[in-house]
Amino acid sequence: MLVIPPGLSEEEEALQKKFNKLKKKKKALLALKKQSSSGPASQGGVKRSLSEQPVVDTATATEQAKQLVKSGAISAIKAETKNSGFKRSRTLEGKLKDPEKGPVPTFQPFQRSMSADEDLQEPSRRPQRKSLYESFVSSSDRLRELGQDGEEAEAPGAGDGPPRGFDWSYEEHGSARSSASPPRSRSRDRSHDRSRDRDRDKERDRDRDRDRDRDRDKDKDRDRDRDRDKERDRDRDRDRDRERDREGPFRRSDSFPERRAPRKGNTLYVYGEDMTPTLLRGAFSPFGNIIDLSMDPPRNCAFVTYEKMESADQAVAELNGTQVESVQLKVNIARKQPMLDAATGKSVWGSLAVQNSPKGCHRDKRTQIVYSDDL
């Protein structure tokens, strides 16, 4: 069972007081709103608020306006006739209306206020421009034209007026300004021009001297390089001569080929077509004892080995280029000499190797076995 206390708690009493205060404030606000809304209605007496006015169509509104215009309560609005085109400024319209009057003085914030005295003094303040003759003729030429008294001589055609090709308005202005300038300013300008010309001449001389020094340095460098190259070439030639002297006869070069020594040996190379062993033995046996004879029929050549080298040299001298039994022979000492040691007797087993060599005169004594086709 829940027990509810008969009285209100402190929090409930505080909330109830706040609620009563809010009610009072709300009533006061409603009263103020009513007074503000009833104020304009009581002052005018006729005006109504926009919310209270009835909504009227455009057609009914135009009819009501026409009736009011007819009754004279409202005057009709007149349309202004405007000229179509560009707008003209008011100052221009004033000038067109009153051409005798000058321009109306108006305030221009960014324009400098000038008086008549300042207008007269302005041309004297402007920097004097050189005349056309002075701009074309250098100051050095003008110094030459100066007389002994220091007065400037007349320019060509100056007495007759400006030259024909330079009849410009700029020349007239320049002559007027130069005539108006005092003689002191002229002398200052002349001295200033003289100093400028002197400075320019000095700078030119300095540049010329610098260029000359640079050219001299370049020439010296070139001469040094040439001397270095010459010394290098001399050193190379000396080194080559030293190498030649060191190598002597053992040196081989393509530019100076040396003649080889003649070959020596006891084996001969024989070339000829349709050669036979009997032909070779009959042709070469008179010159010495033959210890080996080998044939190479596909190449039409043969090798003949003597016991002594002297017999081989004699055979080459007599049989080279001769014709034996209608066979032209070419005889030379062979490049390879395999049986030289055996022939000279330096090797113990040389004779046996020569006798049993595959290219020697040894023939196989075995009989060849031939089988019948039936097997």
Curated annotation (Swiss-Prot):
Keywords: ADP-ribosylation, Chromosome, Coiled coil, Isopeptide bond, Nucleus, Phosphoprotein, Repeat, Repressor, RNA-binding, Transcription, Transcription regulation, Ubl conjugation. Sequence repeats lie at residues 184-185, 186-187, 188-189, 190-191, 192-193, 194-195, 196-197, 198-199, 200-201, 202-203, 204-205, 206-207, 208-209, 210-211, 212-213, 214-215, 216-217, 218-219, 220-221, 222-223, 224-225, 226-227, 228-229, 230-231, 232-233, 234-235, 236-237, 238-239, 240-241, 242-243, 244-245, 246-247. The modification Phosphoserine is found at residues 51, 113, 115, 131, 139, 179, 181, 185, 187, 191, 253, 255, 285, 357. GO terms for molecular function: chromatin binding; mRNA binding; RNA binding. InterPro entries: NELFE, NELFE_RRM, Nucleotide-bd_a/b_plait_sf, RBD_domain_sf, RRM_dom. GO terms for cellular component: chromatin; NELF complex; nuclear body; plasma membrane. Phosphorylated by the P-TEFb complex at sites next to its RNA recognition motif, promoting its release from chromatin. Sumoylated. PANTHER family: NEGATIVE ELONGATION FACTOR E. This is Negative elongation factor E. The gene is Nelfe.
